[in-house]
Amino acid sequence: MKILVDENMPYAEALFQQLGDVQAVPGRPIPLDALAGADALMVRSVTKVNEALLQGTSIRFVGTATAGTDHVDDNWLQQQGIGFSAAPGCNAIAVVEYVFSALMMMAERDGFQLRDKTVGIIGVGNVGSRLNARLQALGVRTLLCDPPRADRGDNERFWPLEKLVREADVLTFHTPLNKNGPYQSLHMADDELLAALPDGRILINACRGAVVDNTALLRALEKGKKLSVVLDVWEPEPELSLPLLARVDIGTPHIAGYTLEGKARGTTQVFEAFSQYLGQPQSVELASLLPQPEFSQLRLNGELDEGKLKRLMHLVYDVRRDDAPLRRVADQSGEFDRLRKHYQERREWSSLCVQCDDAASAELLQKLGFSTQLL
């Protein structure tokens, strides 16, 4: 059995070789000659999986090591009897930590306490729900907007988008990309929403580029709209708008979910799904795959405050490390993908064990996702 895996999926070759012959290939584009005789295809979000790619091939299973699936025509796969699995939630923690890093950077730059802000979370799925829990643990007021969940009668208080826009200091988007239907999210942040957004707000998009109308956003900023903007995703990719990049506060090359843990979860989830599909179910212990981080232990003396928390978070990951490289090379063809392909190893907060002599601080750090040890 021939299994194609994206060359940037960590641990894929080692895992999938237990099930067949593995060939690592670039994801954008998939070499058509590699598809000849292949039985399974494991991709990331850079690969468009549809009839144009797979018609006439022998592929019988597709796995995507990503939470989002808008790059996959799963309806066509189903019609063809091709098995399919994604990796929901695999990078949710990574995206949450990206958002925190960006907010902490802005808090330091602009002289505010995150606890004093109201954060509007648009899309309360795997990412949004985790972000909500961690913000609430820190004492931050959150407002939630999720029309599908609201219509199902889920046990949360959900806000209409138009009201949330007026109330929240921060808008952070965590929705799938739905191009039509009752829950369309394509260009959710359009001219109308941006006009309604009061000056001085923070707008973050770390889900799908087209959820925010990039042309409308650039137009608003050029006309003097006073917003702090964080964009990890762009419309389109990889040919992002250079004028927009020049005006945002933080711009990164679609790497919010790119922790080593998040990537490894994506690989292991599709590996387990494919092994189940073959009738050879296997499970993988994530910790057995991961190397020791550069910083694995640190002692915190006294009570945790927001300044100390920012330093802890930025010790593990500071979003500014990904902003500067993109600005240096964004005007060069192929560099957006190169930054993603050769992304510097990044770990999650859980990789750092913080030794605490204060029980309340240890409890809070645990709720935020750090490993802790009470002295």
Swiss-Prot record:
Active site: 208, 237, 254
GO molecular function, one term: NAD binding
Cellular-component GO terms for this entry: cytosol
Residues involved in substrate binding: 45, 66, 258
Transmembrane segments: none
Pathway membership, UniProt: Cofactor biosynthesis; pyridoxine 5'-phosphate biosynthesis; pyridoxine 5'-phosphate from D-erythrose 4-phosphate: step 2/5
Catalytic activity line of the entry: 4-phospho-D-erythronate + NAD(+) = (R)-3-hydroxy-2-oxo-4-phosphooxybutanoate + NADH + H(+)
Primary localization: cytoplasm
Alphabetically ordered keywords of this record: Cytoplasm, NAD, Oxidoreductase, Pyridoxine biosynthesis
GO biological process, one term: pyridoxine biosynthetic process
Subcellular location: Cytoplasm
EC numbers: 1.1.1.290
Main enzyme class: oxidoreductase
Amino acids binding NAD(+): 146, 175, 232, 257
Primary role: Catalyzes the oxidation of erythronate-4-phosphate to 3-hydroxy-2-oxo-4-phosphonooxybutanoate.
PANTHER family: FORMATE DEHYDROGENASE 1
Family the entry assigns: Belongs to the D-isomer specific 2-hydroxyacid dehydrogenase family. PdxB subfamily.
Quaternary structure annotation from Swiss-Prot or TrEMBL: Homodimer.
Protein name according to UniProt: Erythronate-4-phosphate dehydrogenase
Gene name tied to this protein: pdxB
